[in-house]
């Protein structure tokens, strides 16, 4: 079965079967996606994080189907209805929808009209009607009038109920209706009578009708949200007449009275059983598709936000702007520690601009501020203009920073633990300042869903959303790497192979023993085993370490290669890193081995060229257009300018 999995995943993703086998082997051995994509390129054939995640997801889905098949086979076996042919069909089916169609006739049911008719002994009559040969079905039905069957029509109705259920469980019939939904399904939304005023924000959908397959994700999610709130009635429907005609061509083989009874049962089956069942199926599928697209957008937006360029270790002033309540100002040192906090009131209704300037001047000089981070909320633009019109004794850069989620952070346990003696306004301003210094390190403290970079985030599948966002954060943190001696436990948690417990153990060890001096010292951390060390070491940096490789992305398992390169050139590792001319003399082919290929050697040489390089690049300043004050102000869009920098 496992080999069959490999073939199916290979066909679905267009990745060789060998790569699938090797990648799954690493995943099953406990390797993380960031580790595999960075340090096992020879094994996977150079697969990236997205491809590895896709392999993992497909494998998990196939495992779920395999477990479902086992349950289905056991259930049918217990009923004594499992034939060799049926077992073969189930074992060969890997499409979940088709699998459930096969199982449907055997699936334990609640009390249905058909089941009630069977209990009245009407199944033989239903079989007779389905043959469509007898010209007098009423006469045959009269033989069943006894007990709970009160009259001929009652008998015929029960027989039709049995036929209707048979039609609804027929694979060909279900596929026929399913194909109609796929080709021509129309999504219709109408406002619930009497809810017009309450549903004003959904007025675009009050009388909406469009092709389901062309309905984009944000419209579908909006419609489904309104439906959940009881404001819209939503339905999906194909061409009903065409569907019934197709079903009649399949099941009605005569125009005699028996055929007419079957035709009536087919119409009832479509309206009462088949159409609602397939409609539910398509409602679920379309919601899943919309969720997938929305989650993808959310993850990509989050990735861009997390990988925004950092200002670095500079002294920063963070400002949470406001009008009536004033602006909360904090001063941070180069490590992000809080030095001072103050309130200023440069805007109406208080408008103490001279006093505000004096306080800012004092703080900028006293704490040697290099840059100012202004939150992009209320009074952001006015605060930026106020600052830019002042003459300070130091040159400072002014940045607009996203404050989304800062209020949630400021009230969180993390913030209370960091600043137990300060209120939420100070904590929020600190978060704004730190986001400029290192957005990644600060934003990992906030639930990604609270950062507000996704559409309809509360309407999509929360389990899938969390999984995607957590993986995005993990990928970003490991792409950048972290300083082992300054990283918070929240940041370390996302490092490959660690998790919350080991991350906290590292912080505790650091507090008790001082700064780490080498990566090897990680092995002294409680519960740090060889596997965890292998997974995390390459993503942890130690500036000023005795071994300069400890501050690079070169994995400890490859140190011997660099040491051999240095030895061959008659220099030290430090000299090799510092001297480009020496590095140009290296012929990587000399260091190839059965376990070390050219991808790893290229990564090593690239890292030696720029050890500890930050992939996020240098920070840039974006400014508001001074000519734009309101939505009605004319603008010449010769090029797109961004109003904020998300740092």
List the predicted regions and their residue ranges.
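A glycine-rich phosphate-binding loop feature that marks nucleotide/adenosyl-phosphate handling sites
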Residues: 180-185, 319-323, 377-382, 401-406, ...
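Single conserved hydrophobic/aromatic residue that forms the stacking wall/gate
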Residues: 639-646
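Alpha-helical interaction/regulatory segments in DNA maintenance proteins
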Residues: 52-64, 523-563, 589-597
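Structured, non-catalytic alpha/beta "coupling" segments that mediate domain-domain communication
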Residues: 75, 100-102, 230-239, 254, ...
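Duplex nucleic acid-engaging cores and interfaces of nucleic-acid transaction enzymes
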Residues: 51-54, 61, 65-318, 322-422, ...
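Short beta-alpha connecting loops at secondary-structure transitions
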Residues: 20, 57, 344-348, 371, ...
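Short boundary/loop segments of OB/S1/cold-shock single-stranded nucleic-acid-binding domains
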Residues: 621-637
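Long, highly charged, low-complexity intrinsically disordered interaction regions
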Residues: 67, 75, 425-426, 430-515, ...
């Amino acid at each position: 079965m496992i080999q069959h999995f490999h073939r199916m995943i290979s066909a679905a993703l267009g990745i060789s079967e060998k790569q699938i086998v090797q990648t799954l082997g690493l995943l099953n051995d406990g390797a993380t996606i960031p580790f595999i994509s960075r340090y096992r390129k020879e094994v996977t054939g150079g697969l990236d994080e997205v491809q590895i995640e896709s392999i993992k997801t497909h494998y998990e889905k196939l495992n779920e189907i395999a477990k479902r098949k086992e349950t289905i086979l056991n259930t049918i076996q217990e009923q004594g209805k499992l034939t060799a042919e049926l077992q073969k069909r189930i074992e060969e089916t890997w499409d979940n929808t088709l699998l459930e169609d096969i199982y449907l006739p055997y699936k334990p049911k609640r009390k249905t009209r058909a089941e009630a008719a069977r209990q009245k002994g009407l199944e033989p009559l239903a079989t007779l009607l389905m043959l469509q040969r007898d010209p007098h079905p009423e006469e045959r039905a009269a033989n069943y009038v006894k007990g709970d069957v009160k009259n001929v029509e009652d008998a015929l109705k029960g027989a039709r109920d049995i036929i209707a259920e048979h039609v609804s469980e027929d694979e060909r019939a279900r596929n026929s209706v399913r194909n109609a939904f796929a080709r021509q399904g129309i999504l219709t939304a109408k406002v619930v009578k009497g809810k017009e005023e309450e549903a004003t924000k959904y007025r675009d959908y009050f009388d909406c009708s469009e092709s389901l397959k062309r309905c984009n994700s944000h419209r579908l999610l909006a419609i489904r949200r309104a439906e959940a709130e009881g404001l819209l009635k939503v339905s999906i429907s194909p061409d009903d007449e065409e569907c019934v005609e197709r079903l009649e061509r399949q099941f009605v083989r005569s125009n005699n009275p028996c055929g007419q009874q079957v035709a009536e049962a087919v119409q009832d089956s479509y309206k009462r059983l088949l159409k609602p069942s397939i409609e539910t199926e398509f409602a679920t599928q379309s919601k899943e598709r919309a969720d997938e697209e929305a989650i993808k957008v959310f993850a990509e937006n989050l990735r861009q936000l997390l990988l925004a360029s950092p200002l670095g270790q500079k002294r920063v002033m963070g400002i949470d702007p406001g009008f009536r309540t004033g602006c909360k100002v904090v001063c941070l040192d180069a490590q992000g520690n809080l030095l001072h906090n103050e309130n200023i009131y440069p805007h109406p209704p208080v408008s103490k601009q001279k006093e505000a300037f004096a306080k800012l001047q004092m703080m900028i000089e006293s704490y040697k501020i290099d840059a100012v981070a202004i939150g992009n909320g209320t009074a952001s633009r006015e605060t930026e203009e106020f600052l830019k019109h002042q003459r300070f004794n130091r040159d400072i850069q002014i940045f607009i920073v996203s404050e989304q989620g800062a209020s949630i952070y400021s009230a969180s346990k993390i913030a209370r633990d960091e600043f137990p003696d300060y209120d939420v306004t100070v904590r929020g301003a600190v978060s704004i300042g730190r986001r400029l210094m290192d957005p990644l390190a600060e934003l990992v403290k906030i639930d990604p869903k609270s950062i507000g970079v996704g559409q309809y985030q509360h309407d999509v599948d929360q389990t899938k959303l969390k999984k995607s966002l957590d993986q995005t954060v993990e990928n970003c943190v490991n792409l950048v790497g972290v300083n082992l001696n300054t990283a918070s436990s929240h940041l370390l948690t996302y490092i490959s192979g660690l998790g919350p417990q080991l991350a906290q153990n590292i912080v505790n060890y650091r507090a008790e023993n001082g700064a780490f001096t080498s990566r090897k010292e990680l092995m002294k951390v409680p519960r740090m085993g060889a596997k965890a060390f292998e997974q995390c070491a390459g993503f942890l940096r130690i500036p000023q370490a005795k071994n300069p490789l400890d501050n690079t992305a070169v994995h400890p398992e490859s140190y011997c290669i660099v040491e051999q390169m240095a030895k061959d050139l008659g220099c030290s590792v430090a000299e090799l890193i510092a001297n480009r001319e020496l590095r140009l003399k290296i012929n990587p082919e000399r260091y190839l081995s059965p376990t070390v290929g050219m991808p790893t050697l290229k990564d090593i040489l690239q890292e030696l060229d720029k050890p500890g390089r930050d992939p996020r690049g240098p920070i840039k300043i974006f400014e508001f257009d001074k000519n734009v004050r309101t939505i009605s102000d004319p603008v010449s869009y010769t090029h797109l300018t961004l109003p904020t920098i998300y740092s």
